[in-house]
Amino acid sequence: MAAQDQASPQTSRKEAAPALAKAQAALTHGDSQGAIRILSDHLQIQPGDSSARLMLGQAYALAGQIDLAESELQNVLKMAPENFVALAALGEIYEQTGQPEKAEAMLARAAKAGHDQPEIRLEWAIVLARLHRYKESQSALAGLAPPADSGKRIAFYRLKASVASGLGNSVTAASEMEKALALKPQDPALLLATAAAQLQRKNWQRAGELANVVFTQTRDPSAGLLVLEATLGSHGDVHQLLEQLRNTAVPQAEEVAFRQRLAELLIANGHVSESIDELKRAAELAPARADLLFDLSLAQFKAGQLDGALNSAEKSKALTDSAEVEDLIGDIQEERGDNLMAVQSYQAAVKLAPEEEKYRISLAVELMQHQGFDAAKVVLQQAEESQPRSWRIQLALGMVEYFTGSDATASSILIHAADLAPDPEVALTFLGDIQMSQTSVPDSAAVDHICRYSDDHPQNGKMQLNCGALLFEQDYVAGNRTHVDEIVKRLREAAEILASDPAPHCELAKVYRSMDRWHEALPEAERCARMDVNSAEAHYRLAQIYRRLGSLEKSQQEMKLYEGASRRQADENTRRDETMKAFVYTIRREAQSSKQ
């Protein structure tokens, strides 16, 4: 029995060799069914022959009998778990059948078991890239030499470009695409792909040259769009190119997408008015698409075509009402001066999307703009109940309090908004403005927050200014001069950063004057008055300094300027109106970003 057992493997291999050779010959000639018959017959006699079973799995795969192929390959792995050929073949099957996660797992095992066989590592890298696992794909490709075959080499460079692009390395991506293009320099697909890579790199000239080769030869609309993007990126004249694109023949099934993309490129580069005709054409071609009408309305609104914008928005609403379109209609009605209709639209937006802060903020801001502060406060308090940790809602609540004269309450709420915000700068900016405008002693918690932020962001001139100025106000009232050096340092840094802003110089003049350092106060006060000729306070302060230093004639001249500026001086309501404008712009921008 032992002798038979010892002879058996040798006999099996001898018997298997002719069967495997015949099956391989059949596969070589494309006869996968013939190979399947030969191998199946052989495995009836030798069911444990893993080589035959592996070949059978491959034959099934070539014949398109995927389930049978997977079954046979799994049987091979039961017998030989580290058979890298079977692992790779299974990985390829999973990839072809849309199961990239399973494919990746098999190819990872195959690469390890096959001692980093180049072909397997390359296939593994491809699957990793398709899974957007670019760092791992880059590692799989590391050290691999480009294939000798030209077609495979092009695919290799394109893969490396894709991985580099996925990692945000546009320079390397463009370089790899240029290598691929060099192997087939007249290929339209490679020209366009390389142009797209150069666009990502912002190499506008090279991108335009490559795409224009294809566009000139073929009038391919996609090539034309790449030329347009490159021209817009380089701030070139697009009028002639736009005319060519508008006259380009586009397949009917692709025209809507073409017009939409053309409009998107124009809008993204500030050519809003030019985008309107493209969006109109797209909306005509697809009249049932509410999104196209919405985009058209938004472009018309930005271009100041308010009647057209309202008409397009109403058509979009008739197709599909949404909070987004109601919010846009509210913006349009506000711009048209119909605040009652604007309020109704904003209320409709809130009703359609009660959990989205953007629409509640839009409604509250509309009410605030027309002095409906109590109503705005109710809207924001309702929003606060559902979203207590929304810093934007807290910012708006704080500003409502400020606009109604409750500066202390406003500051407290804005401090809370700053604590909630991922970046507190917006809330702290308004907090600083409120504190700077007060005649009372600055709030110590507010000053602490502003100064901490300025310490963490030393290049933020506005925060350095506010911190220095507020520290001075605190110390001046308390008769404390221990922070003078810090205050002066902050204000000088602010003056350097905010080169065109008179405020740091005005504040420095106040500090030096309070310390009787008149000769140092003078140049700062002169700069302050020269840079802000309408500031009554600046002229009055400079007049006092001139008098103190004995320049009576100059003092009298400054007093005359002070009297004229006093008559023109903005009152508290005007200052609040200016703050309102800044707030409305900021909060709408922030609310919009929260929805994106």
Regions found by a protein language model. Name each.
Residues 45, 79, 113-114, 147-149, ...:
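Structural marker of alpha-solenoid helical repeat scaffolds
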Residues 129, 215-219, 419, 530, ...:
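TPR/TPR-like (Sel1-like) alpha-helical repeat modules
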